Amino acid sequence: MKKKILFNGLGNRGWIGGLYYIKNIMFSCLQNENIMERFSLVLLIDPEHADIFDCFKENVNVDIRVYDGNNKIKLALYEMRLIWFGGVKYCYALELNKIGKLFKKKGIFWIPDFQHRTLPEFFGAEELAHKEKNDLAMTGSDNPMVLSSFDAARDLERFYPGHRCAVEVVHFVSYIEPEVCAITPELEQSVRDKFDLKRNYIYIPNQFWQHKNHIVMVEAIECLLKEG
């Protein structure tokens, strides 16, 4: 019987990017024959965001568990039953809360980036202390650590040179929905007509947060205009 990898999407409800990152890693696992020979995937998600993972509904190697509720004690009991009696071998991304500490040996950690170190002015004192405490606990463990970029891996070495975790870099890569593959030249032209786009354009989908540093994009466009 296959062991299971649990992907916990409940911890990313406040950040949609984290859920899409989980979706991407699940998709990558499903394409890996070695992983699929040994494991099946379990996703724990809330009803509000379950549709993000609809593409996995028909996959026999994915068990989607939709948990509806905000009671922390009931959720903890649900997670404990799922992990203890559900054949779960690994938990991603494990949070080092009271429940997570019970399953630390099964944990795979994830730190998206180290913004609180490089841009501390964007965080309050309490949040900074909380992030630093968590990062020290995770990097001081010998559990596997997933990072989202080689830049984050360099930051890990810079800020936590004595870390014990084994690091794997898994880049942010967008899962391409089937609908995108069906886009035709006619549909493209209809979008151009709708928004009166008579010339080539650049689409920048980043949200307007200060740390996204949109000025780099503006400066790049200025350079292109100067170069003709």
Feature map (PLM): residue ranges:
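Carbohydrate transferase catalytic cores enriched for Leloir-type hexosyltransferases
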Residues: 1-228
